[in-house]
Amino acid sequence: MTNNAKAISTFCSHLCVAKDVRPLEPSEWSALAAKMLEIGVAPENLLSFSAQDFIEILGETPESAQRMTRLLERSASLAFEIADYEAKGIHIITRADDEYPKQLKEKLKRSCPPLFYCAGDMSILHRKAVGYVGSRKVSPEDAKFAVDTVSKTVGNQYAVVSGGAKGVDT
């Protein structure tokens, strides 16, 4: 994992977070990333920032600076947690990674998630994809329709994407 990816994970991951500290939401990370780009600060630079640096260099409020430093405090435990995930075949991909889907960045721009967790064949992240969502309660006919539709989608060389919530799509 690159230092830029470590920084994004440190500020945006929900792993190893204290109950009284929230990781940055995608919109918050996007706003911070825009500030950093404007003044030439790379995400990895944040790993050595103090609360005062967040205030003076990035113009953060004292409350926000405290939140950022609290998120930084978990970097060691987060590194162990990420290593555990990696050992189980679960990977974290951040906006800073080459593996991050270009289509996602192009379509969503600043709204794209700063990171996501994935497992399996990462090459599908760069294929055309169709997303499916559906109700939890479906009739047998609806379930068959979903299976047939997904089979045709896969047969046409599209990846199938699901949000993972319980429903006909999972």
Regions found by a protein language model. Give the residues of each.
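Short, positively charged patches
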Residues: 1-144
